């Protein structure tokens, strides 16, 4: 078997008869595997099994090395086009002072202007766990300060010892 899984080339194809298609789209019809292999050899190309489950199996005459190179190139292009969303985390406590809130809001605004998502986390310590609503209230206060330049992606919710809220840059 060839290096890639489920791709059969040339002599690896076990079917006695195949439906053969040329690299340029020429349909050779249903012919024996040997005849298809001869045509491929005369052209200096490979016989590649495309649809093994079809009756009869479909083979294509092509330059397999070139085909594989183009597939890898397409995958690299697709990977480049994918945008990685960076999430910045800002941790707060319930007893944070107003000037500290302002400082953290300033950082959040910078992150949002850079197009990054921001996750605000309020850590609940000790007895604060008994009343997680104070964390939600805290994040609602934060939301009032950032709502002019952010959209709320996730409302404040308790997750373990944290109350989390996710905001994204405002669109448009």
Swiss-Prot record:
Domain of life: Bacteria
MF annotations from Gene Ontology: ribosome binding; translation initiation factor activity
One GO location term (cellular component): membrane
InterPro entries reported in the protein's UniProt record: T_IF-3_C_sf, T_IF-3_N_sf, Translation_initiation_fac3_CS, Translation_initiation_fac_3, Translation_initiation_fac_3_C, Translation_initiation_fac_3_N
One GO BP annotation of this record: ribosome disassembly
Subunit structure and binding partners: Monomer.
Similarity section: Belongs to the IF-3 family.
Physiological role: IF-3 binds to the 30S ribosomal subunit and shifts the equilibrium between 70S ribosomes and their 50S and 30S subunits in favor of the free subunits, thus enhancing the availability of 30S subunits on which protein synthesis initiation begins.
Protein name: Translation initiation factor IF-3
Protein species of origin: Campylobacter fetus subsp. fetus (strain 82-40)
